[in-house]
Amino acid sequence: MAPYQLQPGIWSLTCKKSYQQAVEEAGPPLSSLAQAARDRSPRVFFLSCLCLSCLRSTAGSRTGGSASRRRPESLSTMDSGPSSPPPTLSDPLDAFPQRSLEAGDITVLVLYFLFVLAVGLWSTVKTKRDTVKGYFLAGGDMMWWPVGASLFASNIGSGHFVGLAGSGAAAGISVAAYEFIGLFSVLILAWIFLPIYIAGQVTTMPEYLRKRFGGNRIPTTLAVLYLFIYIFTKISVDMYAGAIFIQQSLHLDLYLATTGLLAITALYTITGGLAAVIYTDALQTVIMLVGALTLMGYSFAAVGGLEGLTEKYFTALASNRSENSSCGLPREDAFHIFRDPLTSDLPWPGILFGMSMPSLWYWCTDQVIVQRSLAAKNLSHAKGGSLMAAYLKVLPLFMMVMPGMVSRVLFPDQVACADPDICQKVCGNPSGCSDIAYPKLVLEILPTGLRGLMIAVMVAALMSSLTSIFNSASTIFTMDLWNRVRPRASEQELMIVGRVFVLLLVLGSILWIPVIQASQGGQLFIYIQSISSYLQPPVAVVFILGCFWKRANEKGAFWGLIWGLLLGLIRLLLDFVYPQPRCDQRDERPSVVKDVHYLYFSMVLSAVTLLVMSAVSWATQPPSQEMVSRLTWFTRHDAVIQKAQGPPASTLPPVLSQCGTAEASGSGIQLDIVPEDKPKMHSGWSRRGRLL
């Protein structure tokens, strides 16, 4: 039996401490809590304080005063009935007990890193990396199972583990609706959007828009927007979530740990390209599933299964909560996904309609996701990968959301803290500490070895997400921005530029760490979803109309995109200027911020973009047949339109063919003129000219 599961009476016989000594042992931060608990149940509090004193004394004798082995003493009594007191840590304000990793945990971590490096290096040798397609699209030779695993691993980063569990602890299961909407969106990608992308022979999403609408305004705008989202939103969220585990569980300097992770991640991203990313994602998907399912089993066992969770969640209140305040109370609709359309945190019309547009953007037009599907060897394997990812999308409700709710039941004084001052002491965030729910479970209830496995899971989620961002951002920069600067760049130059850009991303990520630390939200997942609702719907509408309406043209798409993004940026700035007040504060924000839910605003942005794009397209010249053929759903089977070519070389005047070489390009002819006394292919003597 573990030490924290011993009966309180045994502890009292062993410790020989009086009630008053136990109270004093609790320390000044707990004096008010001790007094309240003593008034309610002196006997229970007496035994708890004795247990507290013994745990501290035992830990002090082992580690010289460091509480490196503390665990919640009340886990063994969680199933004793509704009248059981909430579980109490040795220090209710200590969110992360300072325990050191044991040999088993370190062994698991070392084996994990060695295995990941071995798989990454193996994939660099196995796959072709000397061509642009081989590096950025894995040679188009991936089978369905690594594609599906990579889709899931790219989507489920450390931000999901921390964010979904935190939102589950704070508000219940409704946040899982994002996962269920994504389940359908990934299928829409494979069956509707992907056939269009394959028919159009595109590598990146800005490239599709360039072919579909022509011009450079839309592709360039979206390429910059995508890089902005990747660098300052995705990386920042994943790094913040991963930093919670790295800094607290490994007790390493944040910059040192982050730099090491980014260096390993960039190593096999730079050397191996997309193939290395997909194979390592497949490995890390297995690790994530095994670790998360294991923690789920421990979590449900601690509260008596799903039935115990439904009973105890509504009584999981912080002991320091004011009785006259509604702050910190669990939501009455915590176990409902579809909630009130006006007063709830996630209204059901917003879930069905407002949530759909950001989801379609992410799964059907985001470079990170689409690039993995384009790497499949054919459309059938791409569909198989999407089906696999769709099945896996059912699991986050049980692997992340519900364990977060369990964490609130087990640790209400920390996860469900309601007083801003107490929350500041617990997690450094006066808005709330729900985001520590998942790390709390890992560090408190798992035994040696499994704790190391779960840390490896979080590292796997962080690295898989970062590799996806690094590779896809490198692809966009190289193929859509660098190609515009140097249209005649060789494949070798494009490969070098892509790898150098990954290094710049690594440097930018490290420099962004202070911003991550200073931008904590009360609910990380909801915070990032609100930003997505302000920036992504206009882009999704442009892609949807471009794929399904042949009349849509460049002017309509550009102005629809500009108006949508402008309104979204205004709302985003208003959210920063007027942040959501704490529960105990009066809400004095403008009505457009306070009363219009971000999911409803997503619907407004979609409607505005749709109307502007349709009106401008009807009022201007329709697109040419070349911009429609094989680039919409209805024209994807059209014959390939051959561009007009110049006259063949054999029809050139003999005098020109005798002077060097001639190459036809469109309506022009490029000549390499070589003096008679020099070798014909000597580049130092060639002169280029163009006949129009």
For the regions a protein language model found, what residue spans apply to each?
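Membrane-embedded helix-loop-helix hairpins and adjacent transmembrane boundary segments
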Residues: 2, 49-54, 69-692
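Low-complexity, intrinsically disordered or signal/transmembrane-proximal segments
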Residues: 4-7, 19-21, 35
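N-terminal leader/targeting signatures
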Residues: 27, 40-42, 48
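Basic polycationic patches enriched in arginine
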Residues: 38-43, 56, 62, 69-71
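Intrinsically disordered, low-complexity polyampholyte segments enriched for Lys and acidic residues
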Residues: 16-17, 24-25, 38-39, 73
